[in-house]
Amino acid sequence: MKEVLRKVKDASRVTATLNGEIKRKILKEMAEALEQNSSLIINENKKDLKYANENNLSAALIDRLYLDEKRIGSMADALRDIATLKDPVGRVIDGWMLDNGLRIEKVKIPIGVIGIIYESRPNVTSDAAGLCFMSGNACILKGGKEAMYSNIAIINVLRDVLERNSLPKDAVSLLPDYSREGVYKLIQEDKYVDLIIPRGGEKLIKFVSENSKVPVVKHDKGLCHIYIHKDANIDEAVKISVNAKVQRPGVCNAVETLLVDESVKNEILPKLKAEMEKEGVELRGCEKTLEVIDINKATEEDWNTEYLDKILSIKVVRDLNEAIEHIQTYGSGHSDSIITENYSASEEFLNRVDSACVYVNASTRFTDGGEFGFGAEVGISTNKLHARGPMGIDDLTTYKYKIYGNGQIRE
């Protein structure tokens, strides 16, 4: 593994110096190549699907794993979108002149080698490779073994493009070891790897966070909340809540707990129940919720659970303070929303809720790099350092200081 990582590190020194025009050209060629090789990728994907079915993997996981012409086209389009983004490398963030004549510039630079650990979605392979490349980084990717054949096919297509352009193919690499031991070895290699981004289940995140010698930006669970304030537009609150739960229930920005102000519970809960049941959502409520609608009783465990399914917990709260306290206790720092027509209540919620993305009168489903205008994303960070929220190419850079002098010495 050290030899693989050494080559990736060497490649990162080349990618760091590429200008935006070259990077855009390569990304467009990578997009073309994915589409031209779609039959090959689909054939390899069938091997992964066979493994998934033989090992009784969940329907949701198999859906994330599945590739067809349309999905490969979307992967190619994502690379084209990345190619349209402004190159962050070399951008001057700040600059000033000292009294002694030294001119200082704070300039964006690539991080170096980024290790990304993720599970069954092969589209992450091309997205991550594209984002890392556009931001001047090299990447070492560790996908799940259930997507092994698909990932190898995708990476080989991308590497061929680099080679044809006389660039180091190792700038886009797969970790050769798919085992947990392979992950452990990767996260010990702080000599070669500059940042680790784990995307996946709670156990994976915990394992990486506790064992890594390399700095980690976590993409942890999304235990998202919507609080329906006493001054909410009821119809809007129902519409937003249904969207946040059912549009894609298996993703990290779907809502898991609904907090309802006590003063509007009788008006809103029956409407919520009717609309959620139309969508096949199982509701679980606190004692006060059960006084209004007949649903399953929620337990303490429910407030801590990211369902990733058509299940929603409902808690009636006394006021804004209790809603915020609940989010502070059980939230994961991902995305939380308030539905209200009251400006001061919305500002208090925005300022006090300490999550990466805090909304007013909108669905939590918008927490996404594409929706935010970042192009694709490598994930959604629940860290406070080094990046937070959807991570686009800007978040895959750091900075250095360039100091221009004309003979100054320190007295």
Curated annotation (Swiss-Prot):
Cell location? Cytoplasm
Family stated for the protein in its record: Belongs to the gamma-glutamyl phosphate reductase family.
Question: What metabolic or biological pathway is this protein involved in?
Answer: Amino-acid biosynthesis; L-proline biosynthesis; L-glutamate 5-semialdehyde from L-glutamate: step 2/2
Q: What name does this protein carry?
A: Gamma-glutamyl phosphate reductase
Task: Quote the CDD domains the UniProt record gives.
Answer: ALDH_F18-19_ProA-GPR
Keyword annotations from UniProtKB, A to Z: Amino-acid biosynthesis, Cytoplasm, NADP, Oxidoreductase, Proline biosynthesis
Q: What does this protein do?
A: Catalyzes the NADPH-dependent reduction of L-glutamate 5-phosphate into L-glutamate 5-semialdehyde and phosphate. The product spontaneously undergoes cyclization to form 1-pyrroline-5-carboxylate.
- What EC number(s) does its UniProt record assign? 1.2.1.41
User: What gene is this protein a product of?
Assistant: proA
Listed under catalytic activity are: L-glutamate 5-semialdehyde + phosphate + NADP(+) = L-glutamyl 5-phosphate + NADPH + H(+)
